[in-house]
Amino acid sequence: MLVDDEESIQLLYREEFEDEGYIVDSAYNGSEALAKFRENPPDLVVLDINMPGMNGIEVLRQMKELQANLPVILSSAYQEYKQDFGSWASEAYVVKSANMDELKATVRKYLG
């Protein structure tokens, strides 16, 4: 599942991951992501941190309460968040749009 409020990021990530053979579900905000998560839990989540309403850290916390072993990759345009990601119980942190190969390699690490 891809959770990001920016349409351009949604389109880029969706195209890249579908080209890799993944089925991509997406949500534009935390509430939508949690509703979809409860209906059909994904195998992995790529999650933006800065979103209107519920931020990515709160979404991460709620998803982990429901499924502790869910791999979550935090994604943000802000490099400074990278130093904090370990305290947020995510599996990885990738700077948004900086390196698509890094994000794809991280996803492959968890999904094969």
What are these regions (language model features)?
Residues 73-75:
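Hydrophobic/aromatic residues positioned on beta-strands within the core alpha/beta folds
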Residues 48:
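Active-site residues of response regulator receiver
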Residues 58, 78-96, 100-105:
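Alpha4 helix (beta4-alpha4-beta5 surface) of REC/receiver domains from two-component response regulators
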